[in-house]
Amino acid sequence: MESPSFSKPVQSATVIVGTQFGDEGKGKLVDYLSDKYDIVVRYQGGANAGHTICFDNKTIVLHLLPSGIFHEGCVCVIGNGVVIDPAALLDEIRKVEELGYEVKGRLFISHNAHLIMPYHKRLDSLHEDAQGDQKIGTTGRGIGPSYEDKFARKGIRVVDLLNPEVLQEKLRDNLAAKNKLLKTIYEKEEFDIDAMVKEYAEFDKIIDPYVTNTQLYLNRQLKAGKTVLLEGAQGCLLDVDHGTYPYVTSSNPTSGGACTGSGIAPNYIGKVIGICKAYMTRVGNGAFPSELSDETGERLGQIGHEFGATTGRKRRCGWIDLVALRYSLAVNGVTEIALTKLDVLDTFEEISVCTSYMLDGKEIQDFPTDHQTLSRVTPVFKTMKGWKATNADARTFDEMRPEARNYVTFLEEELQVPVTFISVGPGRDETVFR
């Protein structure tokens, strides 16, 4: 006979994932949920993504620190899957402290997280410039080259900052190779090895109070009954394995990446909340079937303030794409949807939804992840009546405009996943729960 406890799930962790091309509004949801969880974890990416948070008439953009840092009872963790620019991280810590928030004792950084070095950033920009028309659209923050070194087993990790001899040896080995590349391939100035060794040796005492084995810490906290919220950067369609390759990021923003990027055991994951905008955006290059290259697309961008939080680049805009969303929901095992920026659609007479694609004369429902095929599809749209009014004062679904409710209900029926969170404005309180 099976033991009564044999199949009992252990579910104390929730993952928040972007289901589109990033920039879905994860910062607002994580900010709202942070005071309901004991620990908030960032599990992948680096300073190439920005989470925008609006509160107390302030707009704050975080690139590395988890959004929970603004909730005093919340512990924040930067996991092993994140690549860290030490100078950028310390600058972000300083800015948060200047706002009156305590960081020491509330922030833990994985000793296994890899570092972004100055040569990563320079090589990132040089490689992108050399691509010409084939540019990926990198932010130039050194993310890709840092991950390259990680998987080539040449990377420098946070723990190396605490060991001067190891740091010096790794820096000299890396710079010998990088300087040769800079000089012979790109014909650029080499880095001063001694100067960089001296600069990075000074991070030792500054970063030491934050560094720990976060894999063990998180699993022990979960075993003790603590709750954990995991926040990813970017979105599923930019995942290096599951996204629109090669126009992707260098890590795994998907829910599976939450485990590998934090060290949390999979059986602790109870919920996966998928975030999507009420429309769609993409920054940089790559196929975008529902893109609007007309006045409507411009209007979406202007109303939605669609400029990258990290680079300031203008985002491409289009209608929501249910083909892409169905794929993202499946890959991530999404249990509920958080719909953001519904207010951007408040002034539109009509709103369209991409429900399928046409490919070589046939209608398809499955999302092609290879860029060559995706770039050949054309969207099939269903047009709905807009609500032409604000929902900012609504706090329940019934208080929303009928046409807005119809829009949300249609998305639910098509996606077969409940929409439980609806952002009707940028503020913390401008939210409808179901």
UniProtKB/Swiss-Prot annotation:
Pfam families: Adenylsucc_synt. The keyword Membrane does not apply. InterPro entries: Adenylosuccin_syn_GTP-bd, Adenylosuccin_syn_Lys_AS, Adenylosuccinate_synth_dom1, Adenylosuccinate_synth_dom2, Adenylosuccinate_synth_dom3, Adenylosuccinate_synthetase, P-loop_NTPase. Mg(2+) binds at residues 23, 50. IMP binds at residues 23-26, 48-51, 139, 153, 234, 249, 313. Its cofactor is Mg(2+). One of its GO terms (molecular function) is magnesium ion binding. GTP binds at residues 22-28, 50-52, 315, 341-343, 423-425. One of its GO terms (biological process) is 'de novo' AMP biosynthetic process. Substrate binds at residues 309-315. The active site is at 23 (proton acceptor), 51 (proton donor). Keywords: Cytoplasm, GTP-binding, Ligase, Magnesium, Metal-binding, Nucleotide-binding, Purine biosynthesis. GO terms for cellular component: cytoplasm. Pathway: Purine metabolism; AMP biosynthesis via de novo pathway; AMP from IMP: step 1/2. Its EC number is 6.3.4.4. It is found in: Cytoplasm. The keyword Transferase does not apply. Belongs to the adenylosuccinate synthetase family. Homodimer. This is Adenylosuccinate synthetase.
